């Protein structure tokens, strides 16, 4: 299986090939290019095909179009790569409530080829430490209100290198 991941942790931790399912993509609607980025298919394609002004995500008091979500995800993706040094295959912990900005962060992680490790806001530092260590999450995006437990977890983990609020 070929991958664009520079960090091969996920691929290296798959079950042996004989224990993996057989993937059959024989139907036309299941034929995908050799390299596929889900952010390109789920978000960017809508903008490219002229649907950028349509509502994409709604929350109380907020409504973003595909173009607005794409713009936010692109900005976050630039921070991930240029400022935080994320490379394809890195695990990026996401710590936020279910809101539009969390969706933008998830798409940004997908755009850069990293792996999103989403966490629930109710998790405590000890539980976050377990997730960080098992996933070997090297970077984190965190809503400011949830930062205290993540900082405490990061202090106990040599793996997590950078947190952005």
Feature map (PLM): residue ranges:
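Conserved AMP-binding/adenylate-forming
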Residues: 62-64, 79-126
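AMP-dependent adenylate-forming
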Residues: 41-68
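Structural core segment of the AMP-binding/adenylate-forming
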Residues: 1-9, 111-165
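Solvent-exposed alpha-helix faces
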Residues: 74-78, 97, 133, 145
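Flexible, non-catalytic linker and terminal segments flanking ANL/adenylate-forming cores
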Residues: 1-37
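Adenylate-forming
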Residues: 43-46, 69, 73, 92, ...
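Conserved N-terminal alpha-helix of the aminotransferase class I/II PLP-enzyme fold
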Residues: 56, 68-79
